[in-house]
Design a protein with these regions (language model features):
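ABC ATPase NBD Q-loop/coupling interface
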Residues: 67, 77-88, 327-349
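Hydrophobic anchor residue at the start of the ABC signature
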Residues: 160, 422
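ABC ATPase C-loop
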Residues: 164, 425-426
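Conserved ABC ATPase signature
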Residues: 146-150, 154, 408-412, 416
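Helix-to-loop junction immediately C-terminal to a conserved catalytic motif
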Residues: 64, 318
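Conserved ABC ATPase "signature" region
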Residues: 125-142, 386-404
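Catalytic Walker B motif of ABC-type/P-loop ATPase nucleotide-binding domains
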Residues: 171-175, 433-437
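Conserved beta-strand-loop-alpha-helix hinge in the C-terminal portion
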Residues: 227-250, 475, 485
Length: 485
């Protein structure tokens, strides 16, 4: 039976119950979350808030049944419809912070259909659901489109479409709009709202940016590593505890984070010149005719909708993609004896000249602990062990990662992974720092700290080039803008 003309069928909404529940990742001393008590009724729409590292992602992964017993230690109980989540995985659909981690197959249609196939949905019904889900999330591409050509934001919509097609009783969204442009944020939010209204499924959303989801949810739960901090209607929670929550790092409407404190800047000099530059992949141009300069002691941002080429431009500037046409040349001030073409630089030459932070942080992790990850660059520069340790310790403290020094990078929250990826690039002290969505996954406190750190780098003479959808970051940090709209 379809509902509201969406083509989606009614489902049996799931109930959630947690009693003194806790989870500790393997090799960690601290619990990700502990003493959690809550009950979510069938069909409720719940926004889960909390500071970065509060255990939000751990909770939704546990509800999705993807935390295996050998991945950590559990205490208490966490149940869906009276059963452990792992006993009924088809009941929950999960969209993670990193859409790349959920792209499984090579074509868009096949990827959306994958979950339905695993649930044994009849073939004709699968493809009907695939078309409905594509329409619901506004992903206007042919079913045969290769998934590897999609932008980060498009992959986020693809992941959401896969969940919508499964029509689960519980929809779990972990920062579902993190990689979307402002228009895409509203489109996906509305797509979620329509699909939930049509199916009646229970909804649990994790999102740092509260305002986007207030029109959709009917309940807000705030958690910390020690359990539930606040629970009630959105109006009750935000009116009664708005200032307290903002002070803890929750993005509460009306409580903007502080702007960075600036000092006098070092003198500026040109480092990279782009003239009539064309960028793309596999020999095919995405953007053409770009001309701009990147200078020291300045922040340049590139903005534009999903699929406009921001990531491709950032990777090209970072010396990781070959320009399709035009010119991208380093000045002698940056090249310092190396080739004037960044794409020709060896990895050791890039380390001190241009550091790049990818959109998906875990794509650049190579070590088994946070401390070891931070030491990779300094070791490649052949610094002595004392100098390596000093740099690592400074970055651990500066980016609030010292308590996680011995943790596996892949077990960190999305916000913690982002800070680690920035720290790994800073560890070699490059003159240009290229960042793809640098503020993704941050609470308001860590956002302010990260923006302050970048401001201090710029004031000291470094250059920052950022691809971003974050209007607040652009407002307080940008000196120059390359608009790809």
């Amino acid at each position: 039976m379809s509902s509201n003309g969406t083509g989606l069928s009614k489902t049996v909404p799931a109930a959630i119950a947690a009693h003194d529940w806790g989870w500790r990742h393997a090799s960690r001393l601290a619990w990700a979350v502990r003493g959690l008590d809550l009950a979510i009724r069938p069909g409720e729409r719940v926004l889960v808030l909390g500071a970065s590292g509060a255990g939000k992602s751990t909770l939704v992964r546990a509800l999705a049944g993807v935390l295996a017993p050998d991945e950590g230690e559990q205490e208490g109980s966490l149940l869906i419809d009276g059963q452990p989540p792992i006993a009924g995985r088809g009941r929950a659909g999960l969209v993670l912070q990193d859409p790349d981690s959920q792209v499984i197959l090579q074509r868009v249609g096949d990827d959306i259909a994958f979950g339905c196939e695993n649930l044994g949905v009849p073939r004709d019904e699968i493809w009907r659901r695939v078309h409905v889900a594509l329409d619901a999330v506004g992903l206007d591409v042919p079913l045969e489109t290769p998934t590897n050509v999609l932008s980060g934001g498009q992959k986020q919509r693809l992941a959401l479409a896969g969940v919508i097609a499964m029509q689960p009783g519980l929809v779990l969204l972990d920062e579902p709009t993190a990689n979307l442009d402002p228009t895409g944020v509203i489109e996906v939010r509305d797509a979620v709202s329509r699909s939930i209204a049509a199916t009646g499924a229970t909804l649990v959303v994790i999102e740092h940016r509260v305002a986007v989801w207030l029109p959709v949810v009917d309940r807000v739960i705030v958690i910390s590593p020690a359990g539930v901090v606040a629970d009630g209607s959105p109006d009750e929670v935000l009116r009664a505890r708005g200032a307290e929550l903002a002070a803890a790092g929750v993005w509460v409407p009306g409580f903007p984070p502080p702007a960075p404190l600036r000092t006098s800047r070092a003198a500026s000099e040109a480092l990279v010149n782009a003239r009539d530059l064309s960028v793309g992949r596999d020999g095919s141009a995405i953007r053409e005719g770009l001309s701009f300069d990147v200078s020291s002691a300045s922040t340049t941002v590139t903005t534009g909708p999903n699929g406009s080429g921001k990531t491709t431009l950032a990777l090209t500037l970072g010396g990781l993609l070959q320009p399709i046409g035009g010119e991208l040349r380093a000045t002698s001030a940056l090249a310092a004896g190396a080739s004037l073409s960044p794409i020709m630089w060896r990895s050791t030459e890039l380390l001190t000249r241009i550091g790049t932070v990818f959109q998906s942080p875990e794509h650049q992790f190579v070590a088994s602990t946070v401390r070891a990850e931070l030491a990779v660059g300094p070791r490649a520069l052949r610094l002595d062990k004392a100098a390596q340790s000093q740099r690592v310790d400074e970055l651990l403290a500066r980016l609030r990662l010292d308590a996680l020094a011995d943790a596996n990078p892949f077990t960190l929250s999305g916000g913690e992974q982002r800070r680690l990826s920035v720290a790994t690039a800073l560890a070699t002290r490059p003159r240009i720092l290229v960042l793809d969505e640098p503020t993704f996954g941050q609470d308001s406190l860590t956002w302010a700290e990260l923006v302050q750190l970048l401001a201090e780098l710029v004031d000291a003479g470094s250059s920052v080039f950022a691809a971003t959808h974050d209007a607040e970051f652009v407002a307080v940090a940008a000196d120059f803008t390359v608009d790809l709209s």
